[in-house]
A protein has these predicted regions:
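Alpha-helical cap/lid subdomain in secreted, periplasmic
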Residues: 60-189, 193-197, 201-206, 211, ...
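Conserved SGNH/GDSL esterase-like catalytic core that processes O-acyl groups on lipids
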Residues: 2-97, 242
């Protein structure tokens, strides 16, 4: 396994970060570095807001400057959670252009890149009532219909497959059974299975006590490099937080 993991994503990555860190540490040892650009509702190309917190688009964050600054190291990159921009009303072509930009930037530091698609089967099995419920909770400003979202998601999935083939990325199809009542967030009981598969490691590699709730809480509370709270910008330099069980983490 590589010495450095670079992960891009949104809510699923926020929820699965403790598992991802534990799996990376189990596979690569206690010196592994994890750099993650993530956040609830995170957009690849636009500013995103969750409650009172605002984050720049992944393409606009400080991760890319940090990758240029750090010395070269064997790296695996993960591009995940690419569907939020559909819910924000961006077209399939715009969404794919942002993902392509991210992939091309990552290819400057590694050719080991995993790209996940969208859980289209989970979306398609939604009833109209459930769709309206989740839309009102997750993206209350969205006015797209279920049919429109499913059609755009299908176009994005086709584009992701073409991008993976053209750029030599490893495309990972998200499993339908990873999702339950919530159509876009992986079930908590399957975080370990899902994120180990996305990372490319075995689920049995994580020691029983390695993915502790204390570390998970600490990771959840760590601030990203640049964010706004109630309109006030907050900058937190990311020199790398050392974790007690091993590994260093930088968040953007």
């Amino acid at each position: 396994m590589p010495d450095r993991i670079v992960a891009l994503g949104a809510s699923n990555l926020v929820r699965g970060l403790p598992t991802l860190v534990a799996a990376a540490r189990a596979a690569s040892g206690p010196t592994v570095e994890v750099l993650a650009a993530l956040g609830h509702g995170r957009s690849y190309g636009g500013r995103s807001v969750f409650l009172a917190r605002a984050l720049p688009g992944i393409l606009e964050c400080g991760l890319w400057r940090e990758l240029e600054r750090l010395p070269a190291a064997p790296t695996r990159a993960l591009i995940t959670d690419v569907g939020n921009d559909i819910l924000y009303g961006f077209s399939a072509s715009r969404t794919l252009a942002w993902v392509e930009d991210a992939a091309d930037r990552l290819r400057r530091v590694t050719d080991d890149i995993v790209l996940t698609d969208l859980p289209l089967a989970s979306i398609r099995r939604l009833s109209s009532a459930r769709f309206l419920l989740f839309r009102s909770i997750l993206v209350p400003r969205c006015r797209l219909s279920l049919a429109q979202i499913a059609e755009t998601a299908s176009q994005v999935n086709e584009g992701l497959a073409a991008l993976a083939a053209a750029r030599g990325l490893r495309l990972l199809h998200l499993k339908e059974h990873w999702y339950g009542v919530d159509p876009i967030h992986i079930r908590p009981s399957l975080w370990r299975c899902a994120w180990c598969e996305i990372l490319g490691g075995g689920t049995g590699d994580i020691a029983p006590g390695d993915n502790s709730w204390l570390e998970g809480l600490r990771l959840y509370l760590l601030p990203a490099e640049r964010q706004r709270h109630f309109g006030l910008e907050r900058m937190t330099p990311q020199s790398g937080v050392a974790l007690k069980a091993g590994g260093r983490i930088r968040l953007f």
